[in-house]
Amino acid sequence: MTINTDDLLKKAALCIAEGKTAEATRFCQAVLNYEDKNVQAHYFLGKIALKENDFDKAIQCFKTAVNLNPDYTNAWFYLGKVFDQTNQQMKALDSYYQALSRQSDNPVLYFATGVALQKMENVEGAIQCYQMAVHYQPEYWEAYNNLSCLMRNTGQWDLSLDYALKAVSLQPENCSVLNSLGSIYKELGYYRKAIACFQKALRIKSDDVITLTNLGDVFLAGRDIDKALFYTEKAIQIQPDYIPAHWHRALIWLISGNFKDGWREYEWRWQTKDFQSVQRNYTQPLWDGGEQPEKTLLIWAEQGVGDAIQFVRYVERVRNRVGRIILEVPATIHRLISHSINVDKVISPGEESAKFDLHIPLLSLPRALYPTDSDIPNRCPYLSLPTEADSGLISDIDWNESEFKVGIVWAGNPRHANDHNRSCSLKYFTGLMGIPGISFYSLQKGPRSTEVKDMAINYQIHDLSNRLQSFTDTAVVMQNLNLVISVDTAVAHLAGALAVPTWLLLPFNSDWRWFLDRSDSPWYPSMRIFRQTKPGDWDSLFEQVSLSLKQLISST
């Protein structure tokens, strides 16, 4: 008996579109019973299996389809989708490339390939694919949105904004693209525009927790704490387990000085993507702050060097609660910490820690110690130098002993999420260099240290970057300076911990640890804070620094 396979396949396609997978399967099986190598039937069965999350069967069906017809582009595409959904990115990529080799002008294929490359952190490849997608389909808003995200992640803010604006022009009522654009405006300091984007998104979907949290975040950046807390808590009321909202609420409470709630809420950081990558899956229990005189406690620094320097101050308060303390800190400050902090052993990541019974991340100590020790321990200096630390470093530097010696740092870690705001250009410091009686010494390290070479032609800056091989070296130099002027970096924390007079230069949207509107720091008594009065305005800040420096010199 002959059957009309085309009719059966048409019925199968209609059933798939209507979600009637059981009927569609029967039609496909009927075709295969008559013609077991029918490519379309195997392809349809693959799509049905994918809808039902039967990934193994879907892979088998799509593989059969491409084996029967290697030029079946859609089968290659869907095979890639299955691999993508099962986190087999290399296989997904191979399948997409097979599809593209047969249909090189298909924007959907380029977009899917870009997504796979983005997941594999191949940023350049992903950008190229998304650009090809919009080349062949100029109104492909998802591609513009992803391009905006990638440009943002690579610090190309102008391009990020351009792509986000394009996406919004194509999808003006889409909450996702409005949130993307609003987030970029927020990072660039355009808070009113950011708020307008988020409020428009809320008018479209009033209970969207992403939008509510973003709105709270931009109000936090703009220092409107009441509104920041209102929108953040509204998101939590709608979705009590929404991680970003809890994380932002922790920052709101901490910047407000509400340590009681803030340190508790700060534990939500371990649920965020950034912190999950540094989480430790120890079998030993987490220390809760209780007295355990027979136990050995491992305290491990989970964040950056500056955070480690700032929070090792709390270790002293643990001393009388446990038997032994092992402290793990970044290798770059191991020597300083070993000499300064009273623990039984200091190690660096990767070193054998010896046996321990309990553990705790360093920035969880304030929570564990609360409320018995609820204040900020601010006895400084709490770091000191080993007696052999100098090793001729000071004598090798050309010091102008008759002048006031100022160390400067203008840039932090370029990988920091807020680096585009908290770092500045060296050119802003040049206005200080005309003040008579001052010698300037660059303590800058990293890729931005080379900026001093051009500036030194016209300004007398002593470049110490090649001499500073460790934080111990930097600390040695600091002890011979009259003042350190720095943006928010580990160097500023080091200077504060050494009780060196320090002027900290902060962006308008500064980190929670510097609190709100203060010109002093409860962490470091020797520190004075200069703040931007509006986003991105380094000029006014440096005018204040210049005036204060002139006053300091005249009184010295």
Protein language model regions, located:
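Alpha-helical solenoid repeat scaffolds of the TPR/TPR-like class and their adjacent stem/linker regions
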Residues: M1-L483, D488-T556
